[in-house]
C-alpha cells in the first residue's frame, strides 16, 4: 500500500534561491529571492516585488523550509504582514552568498575594472592601448583588493597609480578643440595654454583664436569652466577624441 509523504505545515521547501537574512530579538528571519534579483531591487532597476521574492513568506531557515512563527514576527517587527516584513528584510538584510558565488562575482568585478582601466590608459612610449588581460593579470599579482562600496570607475582610478609601479602606463589624453571670439581671445590665451599638455594648433584669424591639442582628462572640467566663464558662453569647446592613441594594442609578454 502506497503512502503519501506530506511536507509539514510549518515547512515550505524552495530550490535555486538567493537568501536574504536578518537577525532581530535573537531570532533569525530569512526570505527566499530569485537569484540576481536582490541587487536589482536595491539599485532600483527592479521595482516589481514579485520579480524578486519567490514567496511572500518569512522563514526561520529557507534551506530547511522552516517558517517563522507569527508571535516571533510580531515581537521582532511589530507587525504580522509578511509582505511588509519581507520588504524590510529585502532592504536591510544580509544577502547570503556562497564562497563559489562570491569568488565568481569578485572575478567578474575585477574584469570590469581591468576593462575600464584599459579604456583609460596607454603605453607612454608607444601611445598604444594596453590589453585588459595584461591589466587583469597585474591586478591579481599585486592582490588588488576590491571595495564593495566603490564603483568600478572609482576603483579603476584608485588602481592606476599602483599599476604604474609594475606596468608602463599613463592616462590617455583627450584631444580638444577650443574656439575663442576676438573680444576675449588675448586675455584667455595664456590661461588656456597652461591647461594643454600638448598644443597642435594655435591659430589666430581676424583676432579670434582656435586651439587644438591634448589635455589630461582631469583638466577638462577646468578648461570647460574657463571657456564658459571667460567668454560668457560665446566660446566653443569640442571633444575631438576621448582617448588619443595609436591604433592597435601593445602586446606585452
Curated annotation (Swiss-Prot):
SUPFAM superfamilies: FYSH domain, Hypothetical protein AF0491, middle domain
Subcellular location: Cytoplasm; Nucleus, Nucleolus; Nucleus, Nucleoplasm; Cytoplasm, Cytoskeleton, Spindle
Keywords: Cytoplasm, Cytoskeleton, Nucleus, Ribosome biogenesis
GO biological process per UniProt: cytosolic ribosome assembly
GO cellular component: cytoplasm; nucleolus; nucleoplasm; spindle
Pfam family, one: SBDS_domain_II
Superkingdom of origin organism: Eukaryota
Function in brief: Required for the assembly of mature ribosomes and ribosome biogenesis. Together with K10C3.5b/EFL1, triggers the GTP-dependent release of ribosome maturation factors from 60S pre-ribosomes in the cytoplasm, thereby activating ribosomes for translation competence by allowing 80S ribosome assembly. Required for normal levels of protein synthesis. May play a role in cellular stress resistance. May play a role in cellular response to DNA damage. May play a role in cell proliferation.
Quaternary context: Associates with the 60S ribosomal subunit.
NCBIfam families: RNA_SBDS (TIGR00291)
Family statement drawn from the similarity comment of this UniProt entry: Belongs to the SDO1/SBDS family.
Descriptive protein name: Ribosome maturation protein SBDS
Species, as recorded: Caenorhabditis elegans
Gene: sbds-1
Amino acid at each position: 500500500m502506497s503512502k503519501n509523504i506530506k511536507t509539514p505545515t510549518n515547512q515550505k521547501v524552495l530550490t535555486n534561491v538567493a537568501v536574504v537574512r536578518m537577525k532581530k530579538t535573537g531570532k533569525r528571519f530569512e526570505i527566499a529571492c530569485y537569484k540576481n534579483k536582490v541587487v536589482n531591487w536595491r539599485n532600483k532597476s527592479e521595482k516589481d516585488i514579485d520579480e524578486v521574492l519567490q514567496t511572500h513568506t518569512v522563514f526561520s531557515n529557507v534551506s530547511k523550509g522552516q517558517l517563522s512563527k507569527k508571535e516571533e514576527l510580531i515581537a521582532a517587527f511589530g507587525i504580522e504582514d509578511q509582505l511588509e516584513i519581507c520588504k524590510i528584510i529585502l532592504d536591510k538584510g544580509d544577502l547570503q552568498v556562497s564562497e563559489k558565488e562570491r569568488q565568481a562575482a569578485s572575478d567578474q568585478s575585477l574584469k570590469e575594472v581591468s576593462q575600464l582601466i584599459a579604456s583609460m590608459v596607454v603605453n607612454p612610449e608607444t601611445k598604444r592601448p594596453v590589453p585588459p588581460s595584461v591589466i587583469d593579470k597585474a591586478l591579481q599579482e599585486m592582490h588588488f583588493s576590491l571595495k564593495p562600496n566603490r564603483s568600478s570607475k572609482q576603483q579603476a582610478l584608485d588602481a592606476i597609480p599602483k599599476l604604474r609601479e609594475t606596468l608602463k602606463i599613463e592616462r590617455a589624453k583627450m584631444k580638444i578643440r577650443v574656439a575663442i571670439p576676438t573680444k576675449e581671445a588675448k586675455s584667455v590665451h595664456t590661461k588656456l595654454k597652461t591647461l594643454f599638455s600638448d598644443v597642435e594648433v594655435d591659430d589666430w584669424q581676424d583676432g579670434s583664436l582656435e586651439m587644438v591639442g591634448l589635455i589630461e582628462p582631469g583638466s577638462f572640467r577646468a578648461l570647460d569652466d574657463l571657456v564658459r566663464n571667460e567668454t560668457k558662453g560665446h566660446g566653443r569647446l569640442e571633444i575631438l577624441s576621448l582617448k588619443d592613441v595609436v591604433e592597435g594594442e601593445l602586446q606585452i609578454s
